[in-house]
């Protein structure tokens, strides 16, 4: 179970610098009442829940920044100063062209 995995990760000496993201890549149907932002032909799609577990996460905070599953890649790219992936640039440019903000990189949920 996920809870067992999280408990083991939290017991790790590396946990002080760890970010655990629990999410999934399927929304499960048409339940969401919020219309997805208009981007390119592939998305972003409907909202999906995510939980961030980390000593670096803001405690008791609900982040309303728009994210997609590629936001995890955005975070890794930003954190380690890697070149931006072309697909992320394409998606963000499509969102901006439609008057929407680019997707976030999870940093708003962190201290």
Predicted stretch roles:
Residues 1-111:
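N-terminal pro-sequences and low-complexity stem/linker regions of secreted or lumenal proteins
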